[in-house]
């Protein structure tokens, strides 16, 4: 008689997918890097044109890191080696509010950049009716950038429209 034995898993949770390291865009070791696959899923960026997306991520990281440079300097002076070491004001799903808002800001800059490219000169007359919807999407992403940065810094949100 032959038999097969196996151990049942401890829980029914599926293991987290392993994303390829080649899709990672690191950011100087202090700020968290961005995985292009996770970004595509989060902001519904179509696959393809990976190098353009990588460039958009690099530029977004530079933009947001620049806006948060003074805050970072204060944290480094306080002895924190990276953003993940800074105690969050609140932790959601195992991530600090700082980490979540960093990713929201970077992802929103990328989404706005991708949206602006879609609105660019290659837009045909057949797609002109989508122009306003695309512009509205870009505006929402830019608003999300501003909100994420202000929330990160603990500043109140400001919404103003030109009349």
Predicted features along the sequence, with ranges:
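Conserved short "hinge" loops at termini or chain/domain junctions
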Residues: 1-86, 91, 147-163
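Short loop/turn elements at secondary-structure junctions
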Residues: 94, 98-163
